[in-house]
């Protein structure tokens, strides 16, 4: 190596060492963690496998509560079922703030029901829960909407005549249509070009959010935002979806009948009108748009991705599929559609769905929280607005609660006599005050879609079960299953 290059490297290393030694200890009484470099934070501890792998390695050294610097900002990690419950449930109000995800912050800006904080969040959450409940209990309940959509899916799958297909698009269609019926007051045909474009944008954006480049962006967003990258494509995609939502809102505004609200949008517009003289109201256009984007995006991608994982697992473990179909045949038969009342009579199927959600581990690092005031937790003082990540994967794979956490096994949710066994560690929707807004709808969707498909079809693959790879395509904010082909053959 050239002497000049060696000299340059030596000077660079020396400069970094001086920076490290001169870097003031600014963590105060934060939990322990790896020493950060100035500006870089703990970038050097970032595993190429992503943030989750990195955090799990650090947990082995520092325990269940530790601090990681994402660039210059300290973030506290919570690992294990008991730790997460102690914070998000035991000190629920203190940990009820929402942190930021840098790659989508330019669009969400702390607006909307998922990323809002303080009184804004409380007002929007109360409104959203009440409105979604009302439109789920009206002339057509959520159950009826899901049953009808499931039958549309059955008709579509019959057209395939058992030929191999990628289920991504169809699973997106059915979950999107449920949230659309509640929020927009309509469902879309599976051939609607605008609908297809939105689903494509959702899929691409969900994958980009979980990419390695988006995880690196969390460390250097203040610098990297000025350069091309996945973050710009994500913003562009989300803006296109927002533009479409804006057209729907304007249509609703033009046809609004105050005496007969049709859906979430109508109800929100009426609330806006009612509070237009209140200059401090949270019911304004920006919160409407971002709430709709949040509900539409989350309601589509989380459910459809779980179904994709579920049926990949059914291909990998055909003996589980056979037992589910046997229970379906015994309890439901073939002459009526599944209903939610069937769930309590089908403990094995219910356990399989729970295990799919646990094993899929769809949101492994959870959405970031933020402490709402100076907070004492396990002897550490977390200053107000400190960001906190509940590592949900560490609960869903907690060996204290699951005998073989890295193995797909429905017995994790069955007791000795075969009845459904609940687990404190089961938190795919998070827990505490920030638990997923659509948890109930999602649970109902998974049961009715899963059982309706297996009531009507056998599933198979051209690959032998042992050759089916479950490795996620991306693992970041979400785990994205690998793409695969599946055959749905009429039973």
Swiss-Prot record:
EC number(s) stated in the UniProt entry for this protein: 1.14.14.1
A GO MF term: iron ion binding
Keyword line: Endoplasmic reticulum, Heme, Iron, Membrane, Metal-binding, Microsome, Monooxygenase, Oxidoreductase, Phosphoprotein
Cofactor: heme
Membrane topology summary: Peripheral membrane protein
Catalytic activity, as annotated: an organic molecule + reduced [NADPH--hemoprotein reductase] + O2 = an alcohol + oxidized [NADPH--hemoprotein reductase] + H2O + H(+)
Major site of localization recorded for this protein: endoplasmic reticulum
UniProt xrefs under InterPro entries: Cyt_P450 (IPR001128), Cyt_P450_CS (IPR017972), Cyt_P450_E_grp-I (IPR002401), Cyt_P450_E_grp-I_CYP2B-like (IPR008068), Cyt_P450_sf (IPR036396), Cytochrome_P450_fam2 (IPR050182)
PROSITE patterns xrefs: CYTOCHROME_P450
Keyword field contains Transmembrane: no
Localization terms from the record: Endoplasmic reticulum membrane; Microsome membrane
CC annotations in GO: cytoplasm; endoplasmic reticulum membrane; intracellular membrane-bounded organelle
UniProt record, GO biological process: epoxygenase P450 pathway; nicotine metabolic process; response to calcium ion; response to metal ion; xenobiotic metabolic process
Positions with a binding annotation for heme: 436
Reported function: Cytochromes P450 are a group of heme-thiolate monooxygenases. In liver microsomes, this enzyme is involved in an NADPH-dependent electron transport pathway. It oxidizes a variety of structurally unrelated compounds, including steroids, fatty acids, and xenobiotics.
Protein family membership: Belongs to the cytochrome P450 family.
UniProt protein name: Cytochrome P450 2B2
């Amino acid at each position: 190596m050239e002497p000049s290059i060696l000299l340059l490297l030596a000077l660079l290393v020396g400069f970094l060492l001086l920076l490290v030694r001169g870097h003031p200890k600014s963590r105060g009484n934060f939990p322990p963690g790896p020493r950060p470099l100035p500006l870089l934070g703990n970038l050097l501890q970032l595993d190429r496998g992503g943030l989750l792998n990195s955090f799990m390695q650090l947990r082995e050294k520092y325990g269940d509560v530790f601090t990681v610097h994402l660039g210059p900002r300290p973030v506290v990690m919570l690992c294990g079922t008991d730790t997460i419950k102690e914070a998000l449930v035991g000190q629920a109000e203190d940990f009820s703030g929402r942190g930021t995800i840098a790659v989508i912050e330019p669009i969400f800006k702390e607006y909307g029901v998922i990323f809002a904080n303080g009184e804004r969040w409380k007002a929007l959450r109360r409104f959203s829960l009440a409105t979604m409940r009302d439109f789920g209990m009206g002339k057509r309940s959520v159950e009826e909407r899901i049953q009808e959509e499931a039958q549309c899916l059955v008709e579509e799958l019959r057209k395939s005549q058992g030929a191999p297909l990628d289920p991504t698009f169809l699973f997106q269609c059915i979950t999107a249509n449920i949230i659309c019926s509640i929020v927009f007051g309509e469902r879309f045909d599976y051939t609607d070009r605008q609908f297809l474009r939105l689903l494509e944008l959702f899929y691409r954006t969900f994958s980009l959010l979980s990419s390695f480049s988006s995880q690196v962006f969390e460390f250097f967003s203040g610098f990297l935002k000025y350069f091309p990258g996945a973050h710009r494509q994500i913003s562009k995609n989300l803006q296109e979806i927002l533009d479409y939502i804006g057209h729907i809102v304007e249509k609703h505004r033009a046809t609004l009948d105050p005496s007969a609200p049709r859906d979430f949008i109508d109800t929100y517009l009426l609330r806006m009108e009612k509070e237009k003289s209140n200059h401090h109201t949270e019911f304004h256009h920006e919160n409407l748009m971002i709430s709709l984007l949040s509900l539409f995006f989350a309601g589509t991608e989380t459910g459809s991705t779980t179904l994709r994982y579920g049926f990949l697992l059914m291909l990998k473990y055909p003996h589980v599929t056979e037992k589910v179909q046997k229970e379906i045949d015994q309890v439901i038969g073939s002459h009526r559609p599944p209903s939610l009342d069937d769930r309590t009579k089908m403990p094995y199927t219910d356990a399989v769905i729970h295990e799919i959600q646990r094993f899929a581990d769809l949101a492994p690092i959870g959405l970031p929280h933020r402490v709402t005031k100076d907070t004492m937790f396990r002897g550490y003082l977390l200053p107000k607005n400190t960001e906190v990540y509940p590592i949900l994967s560490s609960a869903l794979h907690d060996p204290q609660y699951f005998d073989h956490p890295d193995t797909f096994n429905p017995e994790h949710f069955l007791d000795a006599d075969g009845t459904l066994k609940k687990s404190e560690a089961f938190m795919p929707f998070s827990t505490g005050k920030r638990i997923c807004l659509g948890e109930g709808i999602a649970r109902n969707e998974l049961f009715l879609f899963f059982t309706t498909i297996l009531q009507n079809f056998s599933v198979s693959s051209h690959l032998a079960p042992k050759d089916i790879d479950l490795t996620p395509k991306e693992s970041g904010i979400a785990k994205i299953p690998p793409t695969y082909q599946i055959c749905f053959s009429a039973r």
